[in-house]
């Protein structure tokens, strides 16, 4: 084991707490355990923007709906089948997630924003036997997209519209539920695509349930907490960390149909929200919302952030609200998702510059990506993690699995960081995003943090592009705050006061928005293609 008091100069190896047990449990068992402990507790709120239309379920009622959903699924599919869910956030999403878990059916989570071609890839690659879909999403006819895809999908036996779901559940006949093991595949989650085509990560019941439990413990979640969830349910943060975190700690899961900053603030006030997990861009929009100071947000005690770099300036702004504490985590879909996290009472003197220490029962090391050797503390390298929460592998992709998971079970994340003397990680960016200019390694995160501290800057992404003389040069894409203006010359001079000359971008582009994944990560490959004029 590697102690929390490791001194500088030691290898970049750190274990999370090993005295915390791994629960050998399937998601359905976690649901039943919650009902045993808090049967009348409020478990779920369907947070319609119109307060009078909000619907609430206790833990006992949640189990009842989940069981009926399981019966509905088993009337059409067998345990072990893969069934896709192509839908925005709604209460039925939660019922189907838990129902599939009880039925031993693997849920394939699908982003409702996918094109017809992208949908066909996910359904085909996952070998989905069925798809449950939202009929119309943001003006797009998803029913037609499913119909168009079906002829090329021989494994797809059934397609169910969500507007039929409640009636099907109401008519469901009791069925025997199978024994589901902790190491069964609960979900196939397709990676967010920051580097290109997504792959299907196979996530187990044990991994999803324990990662959510470890996260909830790290942030100090307690029974009665009210979790306001802006994250998409097809993402591990939404259906894993929040859904299963609140479930296992006796919290209330408040689920709006989509992220809207004004609605989030209204829900925090009216539902007496205590916890919000979001990506940084969501919190920025909430803090920028007019009238935030007039809201009673006195119960909001935790804003937990992940999925994208967290600028220190954002932490300062958020905590200036009053009692609110910010926590920061790091992970990826392949690890269910969190690997490290800070805590509300973190003793680290500069915790806001880190993503914390490993979660319980999680080992982390930082390696030289070329040699595989563990680097000394303070040296940048690739983050690797090993835990019960790491994926089984990529579905039907042994080559990609072998690249991501080594023979000793370490997940190679592709993310760069250094580990300090306390075992905390400081993220430097993606391995593929590292820029080499004239032989010097440059990490975009450092430059982005400096630019984000400029009062006119709302968002920034720095990439490297080919250059004959230097090998690569820096290009900075900048999004300005509403009502603010600045120039590339001014920003360049601003950088020169805080960065070495070779780290200062020479090329600039002002943008209205960034291409992003559904989890809020900037797709730098798309920015690079845009700059180079390639499709």
Model regions: which residues?
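N-lobe entry segment of adenylate-forming
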Residues: 1-57, 61-76, 150, 155, ...
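Conserved AMP-binding/adenylate-forming core of the ANL superfamily
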Residues: 23, 43-98, 115-120, 167, ...
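Conserved pre-ATP/AMP-binding loop-to-beta segment of ANL
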Residues: 24, 39-42, 172-190, 197, ...
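Conserved AMP-binding A3 loop
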Residues: 55-60, 186-210
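Structural core segment of the AMP-binding/adenylate-forming
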Residues: 75, 105-167, 482-484
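AMP-binding/adenylate-forming catalytic core of the ANL superfamily
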Residues: 114-121, 131-133, 276, 387, ...
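Conserved AMP-binding/adenylation subdomain of ANL enzymes
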Residues: 209-226, 234-275, 289
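Gly/Ser/Thr-rich phosphate-binding loop
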Residues: 248, 273-278, 287-350, 363
């Amino acid at each position: 084991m590697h102690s929390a008091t490791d001194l500088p100069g030691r290898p970049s190896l750190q274990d999370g707490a090993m005295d915390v047990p791994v629960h050998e449990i399937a998601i359905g068992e976690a649901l039943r355990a919650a009902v045993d402990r808090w049967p009348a507790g409020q478990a779920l709120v369907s947070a319609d923007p119109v307060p009078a239309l909000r619907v609430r379920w206790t833990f006992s009622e949640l189990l009842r709906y989940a069981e009926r959903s399981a019966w509905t699924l088993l009337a059409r599919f067998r345990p072990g089948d893969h069934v896709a869910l192509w839908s925005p956030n709604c209460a039925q999403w939660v019922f189907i997630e838990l129902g599939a878990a009880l039925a031993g059916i693997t849920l394939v989570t699908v982003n409702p924003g996918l094109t017809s071609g992208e949908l066909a890839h996910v359904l085909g690659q996952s070998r989905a036997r069925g798809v449950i879909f939202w009929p119309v999403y943001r003006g797009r006819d998803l029913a037609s997209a499913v119909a168009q895809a079906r002829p090329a999908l021989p494994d797809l036996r059934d397609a169910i519209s969500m507007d039929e779901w409640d009636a099907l559940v109401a008519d469901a006949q009791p069925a025997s539920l199978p024994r589901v093991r902790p190491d069964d595949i609960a979900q196939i989650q397709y990676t967010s695509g920051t580097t290109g085509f997504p792959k299907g990560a196979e996530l187990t019941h044990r991994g999803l349930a324990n990662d959510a439990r470890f996260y909830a413990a790290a942030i100090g979640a307690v029974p009665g907490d009210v979790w306001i969830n802006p994250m998409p349910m097809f993402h591990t943060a939404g259906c894993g960390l929040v859904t299963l975190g609140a479930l296992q700690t006796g919290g209330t899961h408040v689920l709006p149909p989509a992220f809207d900053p004004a609605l989030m603030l209204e829900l925090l006030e009216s539902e007496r929200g205590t916890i919000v997990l979001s990506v940084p861009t969501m919190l920025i929009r909430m803090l920028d919302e007019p009238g935030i100071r007039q809201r009673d947000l006195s119960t909001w005690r935790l804003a937990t952030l992940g999925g994208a770099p967290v600028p220190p300036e954002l932490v300062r702004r958020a905590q200036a609200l009053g009692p609110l504490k910010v926590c920061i985590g790091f992970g990826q879909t392949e690890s269910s998702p969190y690997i490290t996290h800070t805590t509300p009472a973190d003793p680290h003197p500069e915790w806001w510059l880190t993503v914390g220490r490993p979660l319980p029962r999680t080992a982390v090391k930082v390696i030289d990506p070329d040699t595989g050797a563990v680097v000394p503390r303070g040296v940048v390298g690739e983050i690797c993690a090993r835990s019960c929460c790491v994926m089984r592998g990529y579905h039907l992709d042994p080559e990609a699995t072998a690249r991501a998971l080594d023979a000793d079970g370490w997940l190679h994340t592709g993310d760069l960081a250094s580990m300090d003397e306390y075992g905390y990680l400081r993220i430097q960016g993606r391995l593929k995003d590292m820029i080499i200019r004239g032989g010097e390694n440059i990490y975009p995160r450092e430059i982005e943090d400096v630019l984000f501290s400029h009062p006119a800057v709302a968002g920034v992404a720095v990439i490297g592009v080919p250059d004959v003389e230097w090998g690569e040069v820096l290009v900075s894409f900048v999004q300005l705050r509403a009502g603010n203006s600045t120039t590339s010359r001014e920003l360049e001079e601003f950088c020169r006061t805080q960065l070495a000359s070779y780290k200062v971008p020479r090329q600039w582009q002002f943008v209205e928005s960034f291409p992003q994944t559904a989890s809020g990560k900037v797709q730098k490959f798309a920015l690079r293609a845009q700059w180079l004029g390639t499709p």
